[in-house]
């Protein structure tokens, strides 16, 4: 798969990664996913899908809360809604990158969540914002898990 090729509900932007990654880090600790989205059914479904697959999931409702959580606990993957009122996912991603907020894997991998992310947002916009992967929501559970696994796999080979 080419680095800029869109397939299904996922949009890899940083190059090909192994198709599957283990749910546990080398240390044996479950991978931690920080989900940033306003409360609602999409957030609940996303959390249930990730927890059902064995991930440790933390939920926050805003960009500022996400920054505080990343500084306090870190994360292996950051899944953020791109369109939030207080601080957009675009702005959150830029701040995370600019501040160099490190996770247990070196830096959080951002996933933009939006119902129109693949049809209304260009790959160039995602790349400029340094978003690693994009999925539509609510999205297919298998596509969501595949995206998170690719993000973790990319972190292992980057």
Region roles according to the model:
Residues 1-34, 38, 44-47, 106, ...:
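Non-catalytic signal-transmission and effector/linker regions of two-component phosphorelay proteins
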Residues 40-58, 129:
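Two-component/phosphorelay signaling modules centered on CheY-like receiver
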Residues 59, 86-87:
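Residue-level signal for the "D+5" position in two-component response regulator receiver
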Residues 59-77:
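Acidic, metal-coordinating helix/loop segments flanking the phosphotransfer/catalytic sites
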Residues 81, 85:
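Active-site residues of response regulator receiver
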Residues 103-120, 131:
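A short, hydrophobic beta-strand element within the central beta-sheet of small alpha/beta folds
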Residues 136-138:
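A Lys-centered signature of the CheY-like receiver
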């Amino acid at each position: 798969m080419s680095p800029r090729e869109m397939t299904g509900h996922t949009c890899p932007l940083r190059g090909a990664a192994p198709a599957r990654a283990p749910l546990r880090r080398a240390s044996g600790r479950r991978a931690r996913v920080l989900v940033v989205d306003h409360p609602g059914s999409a957030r609940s479904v996303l959390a249930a899908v990730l927890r059902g697959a064995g991930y440790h999931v933390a939920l926050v409702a805003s960009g500022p809360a996400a920054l505080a959580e990343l500084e306090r606990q870190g994360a292996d993957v950051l899944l953020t809604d791109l369109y939030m009122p207080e601080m957009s996912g675009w702005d959150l991603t830029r701040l995370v990158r600019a501040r160099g907020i490190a996770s247990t894997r070196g830096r959080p991998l951002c996933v933009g969540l939006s119902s129109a992310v693949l049809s209304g947002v260009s790959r160039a916009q995602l790349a400029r914002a340094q978003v690693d992967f994009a999925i539509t929501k609510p999205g297919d559970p298998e596509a969501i898990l595949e995206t998170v696994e690719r993000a973790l796999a990319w972190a292992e080979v980057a």
